Amino acid sequence: MLCCMRRTKQVEKNDEDQKIEQDGIKPEDKAHKAATKIQASFRGHITRKKLKGEKKGDAQAAEAEGNEKDEAPVADGVEKKEGEGPTPTDGAPASGPKAEETGKAGETPSEEKKGEGTPDAATEQAAPQAPVPSEEKAGSAETESATKASTDNSPSSKAEDAPAKEEPKQADVPAAVTAAAAATTPAAEDAAAKATAQPPTDAVESSQAEEKIEAVDETKPKESARQDEGKGEEREADQEHA
């Protein structure tokens, strides 16, 4: 039994060796290659995730930088406005003493010009105010004239309304009369036409009766003559037979 077992094991080993020789790759090598492939796939997956995260981070960083750049000009503009704001106020006091100095140097001529200019300004202000009362007076005069005209025209309008009311009444009366006359005339005409139409019908009927009688009278002699002729012919025929 032991000999058989040994022999069979040797045969199995020989078969495996032959397969390895044919393939050229050992099972250990296959397992190692598979493990390396799996590790490589994991590494590639991890690297891809890292790359995606880096891209997202880069995009977020770019957006943040853009926002910061946008905010920076706004802040600069605000600072510039704030910086420019006090400058006119600072310049005003500086110009004030200079103006005073120049006023002192020029002395009376400018003051005299101002004195001459004030009356002109006062007259100009009074001039536009002056036309206002005239316009008010004109408006009041127009309203008064309109009211007077309305009061003057009121009696004449009443007088015109009275004849206008009477005229429609007078116009209605003839219209009613003409309507009644128009309604009566057709009835009278129909009655006259019927009265005139009846006698001719009687005359026609009587003439027709007379014609019938005459026709009967005319036909009777003819019939009697025909009968006589027929009888004479019959007699002649009888005589011939006899």
From Swiss-Prot:
Residues 31-60 form the IQ domain. Identified in a complex containing FGFR4, NCAM1, CDH2, PLCG1, FRS2, SRC, SHC1, GAP43 and CTTN. Interacts (via IQ domain) with calmodulin. Binds calmodulin with a greater affinity in the absence of Ca(2+) than in its presence. Belongs to the neuromodulin family. Keywords: Calmodulin-binding, Cell membrane, Cell projection, Cytoplasm, Developmental protein, Differentiation, Growth regulation, Lipoprotein, Membrane, Neurogenesis, Palmitate, Phosphoprotein, Synapse. Residues 142-157 have a biased composition (Polar residues). It is found in: Cell membrane; Cell projection, Growth cone membrane; Synapse; Cell projection, Filopodium membrane. Its main location: membrane. The keyword Lipoprotein applies. The gene is GAP43. Residues 9-32, 66-84, 98-117, 158-170, 209-242 have a biased composition (Basic and acidic residues). InterPro entries: IQ_motif_EF-hand-BS, Neuromodulin, Neuromodulin_C, Neuromodulin_gap-junction_N, Neuromodulin_P_site, Neuromodulin_palmitoyl_site. It comes from Felis catus (Cat). This is Neuromodulin. Pfam families: IQ, Neuromodulin, Neuromodulin_N.
